[in-house]
Amino acid sequence: RDSSSGSLLNLAQGRFGPPGEPVRWLAALGADYGLIAVHRDSPLRSMADLLAAIRDDLRQVVFGAGGTVGSQDWVKAALIVRAAGLDHKAMRFVSFEGGGDALAALSGGHIKVFTGDAAEAMLALNDGAALRPLAVLSEHRLPGIWSRTPTAQEQGVDLVWRTVRGLYTGGQVSTEAVARWRAALA
């Protein structure tokens, strides 16, 4: 599964930004990919291990990430549970204010699996977070710090999660100013 088409469709239809706040899209800066990670001391070493743990006792596998039920990070967890052949409605998911809080909870052992994004996890890893990536949710391995992390697809889980990252401005900004920003960012 690939989330990028949904992100791009929303951009094309002008649906982006905080709900209820008029904003104007300026430019896409790049893509961020989903990441599945566990505590570095976890016995889980692969997606196969994670799927086996889910099948063995789903209630013991506590997922967590920034966002609420229905958010992108929650959907990643639900799709992993579905890949294990179980109903996502039985999973335990802890919502955090953001990825940083979720990664702190993972490091503290309060959740078992982080279903966030590579960019936020990279920052945490660089700061010494106690996490081990199991999979990146991209078509191909990512460069740099993630180059040795296999994709979910390499491990038999058909899950790709790309999020478009970009800039937008307030809805009250003039058309001329938006055009100047778009030209500068092109």
Q: Can you describe what each PLM-predicted range is?
A:
Residues 1-165:
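Conserved hydrophobic/amphipathic secondary-structure segments
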Residues 46-49, 174-185:
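Short amphipathic alpha-helical coupling segments at ligand-binding clamshell hinges
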Residues 159-171, 176-180:
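Small-residue transmembrane helix packing/gating motifs
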